[in-house]
Regions:
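Alpha/beta-hydrolase active-site loop signature
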Residues: 31, 55-62, 127, 248-251
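Conserved loop-alpha-helix segment in the C-terminal half of the alpha/beta-hydrolase fold
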Residues: 208-248, 253, 258
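Conserved alpha/beta-hydrolase catalytic His-Asp/Glu region
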Residues: 129-136, 148-208
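Conserved hydrolase catalytic core segment
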Residues: 88-131
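Serine-hydrolase catalytic-loop signature spanning alpha/beta hydrolases and amidase-signature enzymes
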Residues: 29-39, 50
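Active-site loop/oxyanion-hole signature of alpha/beta-hydrolase fold enzymes
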Residues: 8-16, 39-45, 51-97, 112, ...
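Short beta-strand element of the alpha/beta-hydrolase
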Residues: 22-29
C-alpha cells in the first residue's frame, strides 16, 4: 500500500492509499496508527479507494506543535489535517470511519465540512463530550504518562481495550497492538488526552447529518459504554447499528469478520444511495 506525505501546520503527515472506487478514509484512535485497520484494509482494498492516515504524532506522522492554551481546538486541527489529505488526493466526497478518538475527529470534520461526506461511521466512538468522571480518569492518565512514560502507559492500558475472553484466548494479538504502539512519545499521548478531554459535545452535528451513519458498538466496551452508545444512535435520520456481542473496544480485531461484513454492507449502501 503506497505511502505519501504532506506538510500540515509545519508537521510531516503520512498516509496510505490503495484501491479504486468510492473513497473511504479510515481514522485510527488513541495509542494506534493506521495499521490498526489492517484487517479492514485487506478486506476492502479491492472494492474501494482507501485512504488511511497516521494522525499527527502517530506512526510515521510528526506531532503538531500546540500551545497549552489551545487544547480545546486540537481535535478540530486533526480534522483539518484530514481535510488537507483529501484535498491533496483531490477527493471531493468520501465516506469516513473513525475508531474511538478517530470518531471524534470524524465528527469535527462533519461539523465543518458536511458537504464533503456521503457517509459517516463511528466505530466504538461517541458524539458526547467527556463526563466529569471521564475527564478525571484522563487527567490521571496524563499524570501517569508524564511520570512513567508512553510505553508503560500503553502496556497497561491496551489490554483493557479488549474483552476478557479475547485477551485470554489471543495474547498474541494484544502483544501485536502493544508492539505497534512502541514509537509513541509521552508528549503525543498527553496531547491526545488533553484534546479528548476538552472536545465539545457534537450531538447537534450528529443530528444534522443527512447521509447514512453507521454505529459499531461493543457490548462489553468499557471506554464507550453500550447504554451511552445507544443514546446517540437515534440522533441521525439515517442510521445503521451493529452491536457486537462479547466485544469491548476493538471490534476491528475482536470480531474482524463481522466488522468487515458490517462495514462492507454500509459502504455498498452508501454507494447505492
Amino acid at each position: 500500500m503506497p505511502g505519501k506525505f504532506l506538510t500540515y501546520n509545519g508537521s510531516c503527515i503520512y498516509y496510505k492509499t490503495e484501491g479504486e472506487g468510492l473513497p473511504v478514509i479510515l481514522i485510527h484512535g488513541f495509542g494506534e496508527d493506521g495499521t490498526v485497520w489492517r484487517y479492514q484494509h485487506t478486506f476492502l482494498k479491492n472494492h474501494f479507494r482507501l485512504i488511511i492516515p497516521d494522525l499527527p504524532g502517530s506512526g510515521k506522522s510528526e506531532l503538531l506543535s500546540i500551545s497549552p492554551n489551545n487544547t480545546s481546538f486540537v481535535i478540530d486541527l486533526y480534522a483539518a489535517c484530514i481535510k488537507q489529505i483529501l484535498d491533496q488526493e483531490d477527493v471531493q466526497k468520501c465516506t469516513m470511519l473513525g475508531h474511538s478518538m478517530g470518531g471524534y475527529i470524524a465528527l469535527a470534520f462533519a461539523q465543518y465540512n458536511p458537504e464533503r461526506l456521503n457517509g459517516l461511521g463511528l466505530v466504538h466512538s461517541s458524539a458526547f463530550a467527556d463526563s466529569k468522571d471521564k475527564k478525571t480518569t484522563r487527567r490521571k492518565g496524563i499524570t501517569f504518562i508524564q511520570r512513567y512514560g508512553a510505553q508503560e502507559f500503553l502496556k497497561q492500558s491496551i489490554p483493557n481495550l479488549f474483552a476478557e475472553q479475547f485477551t485470554r484466548e489471543h495474547p498474541d494479538q494484544i502483544e501485536a497492538l502493544i508492539a505497534c504502539a512502541g514509537n509513541f512519545s509521552a508528549k503525543a499521548l498527553v496531547q491526545y488526552y488533553e484534546a479528548m478531554t476538552e472536545r465539545p459535545d457534537r450531538t447537534e452535528t450528529l443530528k444534522k447529518i443527512v447521509n447514512p451513519v453507521l454505529f459499531i458498538i461493543g457490548e462489553e466496551d468499557k471506554s464507550v459504554y453500550l447504554q451511552d452508545s445507544l443514546k446517540q444512535c437515534y440522533l441521525p435520520g439515517n442510521t445503521q447499528i451493529n452491536i457486537l456481542p462479547g466485544v469491548a473496544h476493538m471490534g476491528m480485531w475482536e470480531r474482524k469478520d463481522q466488522t468487515n461484513d458490517t462495514v462492507m454492507k454500509f459502504l455498498n449502501y452508501v454507494s447505492d444511495a
